[in-house]
Design a protein with these regions (language model features):
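Conserved N-terminal beta1-alpha1 strand-loop-helix module at the mouth
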Residues: 1-72, 136-140
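Active-site mouth loops of central-metabolism enzymes
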Residues: 7-25, 74-84, 118-127, 177-185
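C-terminal helical cap(s) of enzyme catalytic domains, especially alpha/beta-barrels
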Residues: 52-54, 112, 158-159, 207-231
Length: 231
C-alpha cells in the first residue's frame, strides 16, 4: 500500500486523475491514457464536477471493479463530514484503497498516522502558512493537497500570485504537496508548478469536463509535459 506516497517521494512529478464520475469506463480510460493514480468520490456534492456522489453501498459494485482491475493506486474522497467519513474509513481500507482524501477539518483522528493507508490532507483558503507548517511537520498528514481556492473562483485561469502561494506552502511542508486543478491549468503550466516544489498535479472536471475523450486527450498532454520537465 501507500503507492501514491512512494510515487510522490521518488518521481519529479506525479499525475493524478480525479474522476468527474465514478464509472469503470472513465477509470479504465484514465489509467490506459497514462494516469499515475486515480481518485473517486463518495458521500458528497463535488463543487468542480457539480455531481452528487452517493454512499459506499450505492457505489460498491463499480468501486470494487475499479479497485480489482486498476494497475495504478486508487484513492477516495470519503465525504464532507467528519462523523460520516469516520464511519466508512475501516471499510475503505478493507476494500483496498491506497489513499483517503479529506479536508483537514473533515478528517477523523483515526486517519492520522496509519500504516495501512495514506491520508491526503486537503487545506482550503482558511489555512495559514504557519498552521500548514505545524501540520506537515507532524504525524497528522502524509500528503498535502493545496485546495486553497474559494468555490466562486473555480475555473478561473491560473495566475502568478497562485504560484507564490504554492511555493509558500511547499517551502514549509515536510511532506509532498499535491495541486488539484481548481484553477484552469494547462500542460504548459506544469514546469512553473514543478518549480514551486509541487510533487503532483491532480486534473479533473475543471480541465476536461465530463467528456471521456477530452479526459484522455488532457491526460496524455499533461503526461507529456511531466515527462519533459527540466530538473
Amino acid at each position: 500500500m501507500k503507492r501514491l506516497l512512494k510515487s510522490l517521494k521518488t518521481k519529479p512529478m506525479t499525475l493524478v486523475v480525479s474522476l468527474p464520475e465514478n464509472t469503470y469506463e472513465m477509470a479504465k480510460a484514465a489509467w490506459e491514457a497514462g494516469a499515475d493514480a486515480i481518485k473517486v468520490h463518495i458521500n458528497l456534492f463535488h463543487n468542480a464536477s457539480l455531481i452528487k456522489f452517493g454512499t459506499i453501498e450505492e457505489q460498491r459494485p463499480v468501486l470494487e471493479k475499479i479497485l480489482h482491475d486498476s494497475p495504478v493506486p486508487v484513492g477516495v474522497v470519503a465525504g464532507e463530514n467528519t462523523k460520516v467519513s469516520e464511519g466508512v474509513i475501516e471499510e475503505l481500507v478493507r476494500m483496498g484503497f491506497d489513499f483517503i482524501s479529506l479536508y483537514g477539518h473533515h478528517m477523523p483522528v483515526s486517519l492520522c498516522n496509519r500504516q495501512d493507508v495514506s491520508n491526503l490532507f486537503a487545506i482550503d483558503y482558511s489555512y495559514s502558512v504557519e498552521e500548514v507548517k505545524t501540520i506537515t511537520n507532524s504525524f497528522i498528514a502524509e500528503i498535502l493537497e493545496l485546495s486553497i481556492l474559494p468555490h466562486e473562483e473555480y475555473g478561473s485561469r491560473l495566475n502568478a500570485r497562485d504560484l507564490s502561494r504554492y511555493l509558500a506552502f511547499s517551502q514549509v511542508s515536510n511532506i509532498p504537496t499535491l495541486l488539484p486543478t481548481q484553477r484552469l491549468i494547462y500542460p504548459s503550466d506544469v514546469q512553473a508548478i514543478a518549480n514551486c516544489g509541487v510533487k503532483a498535479i491532480m486534473i479533473g472536471a475543471i480541465v476536461f469536463g465530463h467528456d471521456l475523450h477530452q479526459m484522455v486527450e488532457q491526460i496524455k498532454l499533461f503526461k507529456q509535459a511531466i515527462n519533459e520537465l527540466k530538473q
